[in-house]
Amino acid sequence: MQIAFSGRLGSGKSTVCAILRDTYGYEIYSTGTVQRKVAEDMGISTLELNERMTKDPTLDHIIDDAVVKLSREKSGSQIVYDSRMAWHFAENTFKVYMYVDPTIAAKRVFNADRGDVEKYASEEDALNQLNARGNEENKRFKKIYNVDNFDYSNYHLIIDSTTPSPEQIADAIAKGAKDFEENPYTDTKMLVSPFVVFPTAPYGTDDEEEIVITLVDSVHYCVKGHNKLAALQLCGSAFAHATFQKNAPITPDKTLFKEYEKAANFKFFTNI
């Protein structure tokens, strides 16, 4: 089963990819890997290819076409495409998007040793730069491809790296890919920290349904399944199993957020 792996900046995709490679035997094809293969096929250096692509953004299609070709040629192989847009081009893949709370992403990249490539004055600076880069990237994708990389409905699985370990995430993705290969589906499943999902119903609401989550302005809200969400917050679970519902009507209420925080003695990661 091939996996198309996208996600937020600072979510830890590279670390998870390494575990999928070392533990589960997946080959990893990053954008850089594909670029090197394309440059080799063209008889030029990757530097020259990058220079050409910088001058002419329409040359992005060279990489896109290479991903399509690769996914066809290696259709029976275990491959992970670590690329923002692979979900749009790689055929017959399990499409995964990795979320992370923005403040946690900023903390990670600020404390990481990335040499002179990325430098940040503070965690706040890292947060602002990551948000700006992510939004700018997505604008570019919308302009070139007319798709929204942040739209959860493009993916089969949304997985959250805010609290779980990279090993837990890799295990969940490998299992998800196997399950999807055996029983394909078209909706969007979610494995997210219960501490990044805000309630829309009072604490103690008699709601025994499965958890359904929607996304509004990059914030997760619980549409259904508040009892289960509250129980997961109470026991400190790493993941809430949920289904994504696009454009669900909700009314954010900060008094509800405080009810849930007080009941389970925690704080939501994001302040809204």
Give the label of every model feature segment.
Residues 118-169:
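Small-molecule kinase domains that catalyze NTP-dependent phosphoryl transfer to phosphate-bearing small molecules
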Residues 14:
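Walker A/P-loop
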Residues 8:
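P-loop (Walker A) phosphate-binding loop of NTP-binding proteins
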Residues 5:
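Hydrophobic anchor at the beta1->P-loop junction of P-loop NTPases
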Residues 92-129:
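Conserved phosphate-donor/acceptor-positioning beta-strand/loop module used by diverse small-molecule
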Residues 207-262:
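A short, basic-hydrophobic beta/loop patch
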Residues 27, 31-90, 103-104, 115-118, ...:
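ATP-dependent small-molecule kinase phosphotransfer cores
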Residues 178-221, 233:
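Short alpha-helix boundary/capping and kink motifs at helix termini
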